Amino acid sequence: MNHTTQTQLFDFFERFKAHWQTQKKSLPQAIFEPQWISPCQIGEVENQLIFWSPIKREPALDMSNIEQALDIKLHPSIVDFFCSAYSAGLPAVYQDHPIELIQAWNDEDFNLLQENMLAHFMMQKRLKQPASMFIASCSDEMQIVSVLNATGEVQLETLGKGQEAILAENLADFLATLTPVIIE
């Protein structure tokens, strides 16, 4: 387990919650969807909103099913990023560019995430591109932030075209540079 990635992820969770506390004097809030319950939810629904907070998964999950299906070994930072916690998506800014970190809200969301991962890897294989895994969406819907599976480097990727730029040497360093934001 890459404790550095996990440490930086949980540090970002704390910075995200602190930003909400400073700006809104509360925990983060999400629209309550009764069919989409999460262990992150806290308290009662008010005005169709529910408070929430990222929580550590105990025990952490793994992605051995994806590794077996694709016959690859996932970079440990990818596994730590997606398997360590439940959380809603986390809006942030990277060097003046808005992004949203992808996380799993509940077990069903984690299963959907894994299906999307399989499709992403298969598309890359078909296009003869290096394997990478998305970790964040960008304001340009054709771009994602992803982790190169072979090296752990974080890159800006254009879907169907490949790498645009290396953003960080590793996921922990990338997470440390992010500034949390609140999307109204």
Swiss-Prot record:
Repressor listed as a keyword: no
Family of the protein in this entry: Belongs to the Syd family.
Domain of life: Bacteria
One Pfam family here: Syd
Organism: Psychromonas ingrahamii (strain DSM 17664 / CCUG 51855 / 37)
Disulfide bonds: none
Gene name in the database record: syd
CDD domains named in the record: Syd
Keywords carried by this UniProt record: Cell inner membrane, Cell membrane, Membrane
Alphabetized HAMAP family for the sequence: Syd
Membrane association type: Peripheral membrane protein
InterPro entries from the UniProt entry: Syd, Syd_sf
Lineage, highest ranks first: Bacteria, Pseudomonadati, Pseudomonadota, Gammaproteobacteria, Alteromonadales
Compartmental location: Cell inner membrane
GO cellular component term of the entry, any: cytoplasmic side of plasma membrane
Function statement: Interacts with the SecY protein in vivo. May bind preferentially to an uncomplexed state of SecY, thus functioning either as a chelating agent for excess SecY in the cell or as a regulatory factor that negatively controls the translocase function.
Protein's name according to its UniProt entry: Protein Syd
